[in-house]
Structure formats: C-alpha cells, structure tokens
C-alpha cells in the first residue's frame, strides 16, 4: 500500500515563502481554514500531532511507525525541479532519509513537473491561476542531469521501491514531459537514455509510470 507525500509541511525551503510567507509551509493554509457553513464541514481542525516540521527526522520516525502499523509500506514523494534546481526536497532528504527507521518503509519519486502557479497561495488561488511562477518544462540537458542525480542520490538507496529489480519512477504531467523534448519521438529517446543510465548503474531496468491527471 503506497501513500503520496506532499512535502510542503516545512518552512526549511526558503522559496516556499512566495506561497506561505509565515515560514512553516502548507500549515499556514491549514491554520487559516475556516468553517464554510455547510453540513459536515469539520473546520477549523487542529492536527493530532500539531503543526510538525516534516523535514525533521524525529517527526518522520513517528510518521513511519504510524504508517507501517496501518499497513502502508511505500511513500511516493512528490519531487520538484524549478528554477534550474530541486525544490521541496527537505522533507525527503532531511526528514525521511535521515530517519533511523526509514528501512521499514520503501520510497519512490513522482516528478511533479506541472507548472507552479498561485494555486498553493490562499491569498491568490481564487483569482489568479494563470500566472506561471515556475515552469515545469525543462530542457533535455536538464532532464539528463535529473536522471543522473536521481540514480545516484535515490535509486541506489536500499529502500528505494522497485518492481522486478527495476527502480520505479513516475511523472505527473505528461504534456509538460513531452514539451521538454518537443516531440513524442524525442521524448521516447529521453526515456531510453534514462533507462540506459539506470541499467549502467547496475539495475535490471527502469519501471516508468505516468499520471493521467487531466
């Protein structure tokens, strides 16, 4: 059983101040939520564990223990690349991967390569979703860099999730992924390069998944 992880419940990534200026990430949206007045609305609510920093390894140890106790054995981390560098990696790198019990839980990446708009910003999300703050489209050269980094930093972890000896890698926005290469044929070549690099790193292959979210 796998659970998606939206790694924004931290203030450790400075660039999140664009959306949550108070400095503790998505918790700012949670705390600002009010009762909408319809039957069954249960807001405001306070998290059972409080407004914890999920980039803290001690917090992740607690969450791993809880997830495992309910049968969850894979975390799918939303992973981002904006403005020519990774974004929102703190919860994965500093939280999950430094948790002393992380070998109890497999993990994998879903490259959330959609455009970043004001959707995350409660102050503007109801009025402006057309402005692109960061594009999810990268160049083929950047994608090659992402592949190298992903293989070295994540695939080689003993608890990275695999199917039949192949690391599992997911892409969220298929349209943006194709735009990265320009054509579906070039996109295929990009995936073949990723698979080749993965095999050269000692794996049996690459298990590629795509999300049809539209």
Enumerate the language-model features and the residues they cover.
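Glycan-processing catalytic domains of CAZymes
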Residues: 1-214
């Amino acid at each position: 059983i796998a659970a998606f992880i939206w790694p924004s419940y931290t203030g450790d990534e400075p660039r999140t101040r664009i959306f949550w200026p108070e400095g503790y990430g998505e918790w700012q949206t949670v705390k600002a939520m009010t009762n909408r007045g319809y039957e069954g609305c249960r807001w405001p609510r306070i998290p059972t564990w409080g407004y914890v920093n999920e980039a803290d390894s001690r917090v992740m140890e607690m969450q791993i223990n809880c997830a495992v106790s309910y049968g969850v054995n894979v975390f799918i981390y939303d992973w981002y690349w904006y403005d020519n560098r990774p974004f929102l990696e703190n919860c994965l790198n500093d939280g999950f991967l430094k948790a002393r019990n992380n070998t109890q839980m497999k993990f994998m990446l879903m490259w959330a390569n959609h455009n970043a708009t004001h959707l995350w910003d409660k102050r503007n999300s109801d009025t402006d979703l057309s402005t692109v703050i960061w594009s999810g489209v990268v160049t083929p050269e950047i994608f090659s860099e992402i592949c190298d980094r992903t293989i070295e930093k994540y695939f080689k972890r003993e608890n990275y999730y695999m199917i039949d000896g192949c690391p599992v890698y997911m892409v969220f926005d298929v349209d943006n992924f194709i735009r990265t290469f320009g054509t579906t044929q070039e996109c295929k070549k990009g995936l073949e390069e990723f698979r080749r690099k993965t095999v050269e790193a000692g794996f049996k292959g690459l298990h590629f998944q795509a999300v049809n979210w539209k």
